[in-house]
Amino acid sequence: MACAICTLRRPRRFCPGVRGDICTICCGTEREVTVACPLDCEFLQESRKHDKPAPIDPEQVPNRDIRVSEKLLEQNETLLAFLGGAVAKAALDTAGAADRDVREALEGLIRTYRSLESGVYYDSVPSNLLAAGIYRAVERDTGEFRRQERENTGVTKTRDADVLGCLVFLQRLEFDRNNGRPRGRAFLSALFEFYGGSPSASPPAASSLILP
């Protein structure tokens, strides 16, 4: 019996991503590269503890002109948690979606909310079909969040600028957590832990993601 990936070495563990037994070398080299690893895979979760994302060059981070202050995040804590959960759910419900697709969806959403701020609305749907699906789902859920807020309070509390700021924060978190693998979902793992109900998770430190 040989590894289901390389067909050469002896398999040492079961891989839920390929639904077969694989060797430890292929597990390490093909993880989130050619294999779409389930987020609950024990070997993937263990590898997360040793991930070392490349340092972020602040000059390469998009939307630097949008200031995301700790005060804004504190005042919109409920909105941020909602958006984080909405992005995670939309991506996890989209078969084949990885962090890079979420990055495109977030950029499209940010462009759309930028246009709302300018007074000239433009729906910036990504051309990438996976990213477009995530974009549409988050856009729909955000509209529902604001509708329910108006019904419950009688006023429109959440501004377009608030949504924009929270989206930019999530975009910076994606840049911080993305491990660069083609099928990587380290950012989605973080979102699921922070905003998906994991009892052991702690939210990301805002100060580390706020650009000077």
What role is predicted for each listed range?
Residues M1-I56:
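N-terminal cysteine/histidine-rich coordination modules
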Residues A36, D40-P212:
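Long, charged interaction segments in nuclear RNA/chromatin-associated proteins
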